[in-house]
Amino acid sequence: MSYAKVLGATSRQDGYLEGNGYLVSWCVGHLVELAPPNIYDAKYVKWSIADLPILPQKWQYLVSASTKKQFGILQKLMHRPDVDSIVNSCDSGREGELIFRLVYQQAGCKKPFSRLWLSSMEENAIREGFAHLKPSTEYDALYNAALCRERADWMVGINASRLFSCLYGQPLAVGRVMTPVLAMTVVREAAIAAFVPEKFYTVALSFAGGGTASSKRFAQKADAELLLSKCRKEGRVTVQKMERKEKSESPPQLYDLTALQRDANRLLGFTAQQTLDYAQSLYEKRLITYPRTDSRFLTEDMAASLPGLVTDTGRAFAVEKPIPIHVQQVINGSKVTDHHALLPTKSMANADLAALPAGEWNVLRLISARLLCAVGEPHRYAETTLTTICAEEEFSAKGKVVLSDGWKAMERKMLGELLGKQKEPVVLPDVQKQSQCSVAGAELKEGQTSPPKHFTEDTLLHAMETASADSMPEGVERQGIGTPATRAATIEKLVQKGFLERKGTKKTKLLLPTDKGKALITVMPEEIQSPEMTADWETKLLRIERGEMEPSEFMTEINTMISSLVKTTEARKGANALMKNKILGVCPNCGANVVEREKGWFCENRECRFVLWKDNAFFKRLGKRLDAHVADKLLRDGRVRLKDCKSAKGKTYNATVLLSCEADGRSRFSLEFEGGC
């Protein structure tokens, strides 16, 4: 551990390290969690609309069953007589603050604690952080925001999931952030399905001196054909106007997490979660700064060290030409909150980058390229617009001449093959007003209007980030849905629960709602699926974090919304047909239908115990997954042939899995080997 190394705590014990007057231990995710409803009252074990809403007055917490041992170690360490103070060194963000405080409180600790707040895991940054520990009180508002977020998610999830599950007779997972994100994809698919393409026609004229000009669009083909005939007969165009404007494209901003995830999806095909995982690993290897940032700028005190970092980064990626460094382009302390923009670190200069896994190397490459581009010079070009007349109709053409590549040259150097083939700029002939040009060719072009595009991870992240922006007043900070740290997990959860699926043969997959996802949104009331309401809640959580809003005010609003939801929501007529589970086959035990649910394929007969679990231990031992295709084969044929099964010793073999039933109806699997092997 980096902290232990810097502090000199090098003696490894069970669950912690010790030395030089320090004890260094760790949390494993959320060690302490909100208690389930049945802890408040045993009646909540059974789901019933009559028991809703469930709105705890005094919140209760439990130690997570999977992390009890580590919690016990932390509790003992906190209460050791020789420990006089504690340092909260958890992740420098909202969730890290919550994780520590819940452990501290559940452990019954009263000793003073301070806060280590870092944006880099480099040894110098850690030493500096421990030398300037922050008072814990500076982060009380951050903790309050984290508590409100956790409790609001619990109340919406528990109450809405139970309400809609009871109304429609099957388990339905509803979430404060998850459901509005799903709704955005369903609305987009509905718009695509409802879209009626309209054909249009244009006439394109190519000039003898180079370049092509196009007419306006015609709805009727006959009108375009008439113009085409006239143009061919006339054979010349008269130049009405020639405009040349010099323009520039500023360098891109540094990455925050969402911008990095979007580019990694667009250029590399990575999911948001994959990018976050790669970035987290790079951070722990001290090669990049804190990844879960929402800022795209640096603070003023970083200006002096930035040129050295830029030079080191260029050298690490074999950039031989001198790098222009315009530091002030990336400095704006007023736009930095908890953490500055993502950067490579100076440690990268001495690291063996070739030894990195491919995914990590590519993410580091993106972050490094963005730094080198962000401090570069503008991309300058001249845009030419040519307007001509032929057969009394206006034709226009646009051309472009690059004056200075600027930052785009660095982008090509760093990311060349990822960017794909770039369009060659169109150079128009140099002509004078009222002069005439010969028409080398004229042709009819047919096109049609395009529907909205399906969401990819890139565009869905953008939609989450900018949700409600159009409906919020000017001057109000737009927070979007979720945070940079949680958006990836939201998408993954929707996929895992079967509401979204990734489809497509291209590197970057489409994110499409499943029939199950569409059905869920069909029955959801507006307040649960509204991106605007969820984005408004995120803004209020940010205000709590800044001490501008009382937590009690926010929680009262959530309570009121949930109470109203329970009181006013009724099952929609005809919706049960939409909500029916997909039938996969016939139960081999009792003959009833087997339907797919979140965790497996279940017999619809409540008296029957037959189920095929998706997370199946038998198939795991073979190194395989029990997916829909395998389940379908087992139900139809009672057997499925599997290739490349893995033995305990790592050897591979082919085998057939046979399905039968125990006396009580539960599924039983056995293996049949090929050739007696």
Regions found by a protein language model. Give the residues of each.
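Conserved short loop/turn motifs at secondary-structure junctions
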Residues: 89-92, 169-171, 244-253, 262-268, ...
